[in-house]
Amino acid sequence: MSKFKEIMGWLWPIILGLLIALVIKTYFFSLVRVDGTSMYPNLQNNELVALFKQGKIKRGTVIVFDAYGVDANAQPKDKYVKRVIGLPGDKIEYKNDGKLYVNGVRQSQSYITKKQQVAGTLTLQANEAKGITLGSGQIFTVPKDKYFVLGDNRAASNDSRYYGFVPTNKILGTVKTGFWNDKAQVINHFVPAK
């Protein structure tokens, strides 16, 4: 019996530690690797970022979502990293000079250059807003329980312009970067200026 107690004496802390780690990874926090350049220059290809599963989503928040079923080209287990531009119920308008308006209020896009703000397609391909041309003065509304997301590298990003709005139930959490990332401020704490 004392041999059993001895084994359990060192085995129990290991089991407890693994259980705590599993709970943390499942419900609170995990690491995700950025795949591709759609968030350049703020996130780099292969950069490791923290995913907070209980993070609050607001305009400007960078999120990770399960792309399977959102993007027709996504495979099971594909995860996309994008920036939230529109929340459920928001009215989105792009002016022809790349200025972004949400609910009639101009939004800061200081996290990317003026050239990046107007790069990529300006005609929405998504079914919910198909044919709306950004920059033409047309306004569209983000549906209930969905988000409009864009990559920071607008010219190379496969985002809501192509596959539509991201359902709330597909969002895995919010992204945070380490202090060593010189763009950490625009990922961790960006708040669109009014």
What are these regions (language model features)?
Residues 30-45:
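Alpha-helical transmembrane signal-anchor/signal-peptide segments
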Residues 3, 7-8, 12, 45-194:
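Soluble "head" domains of membrane/secretory-pathway proteins
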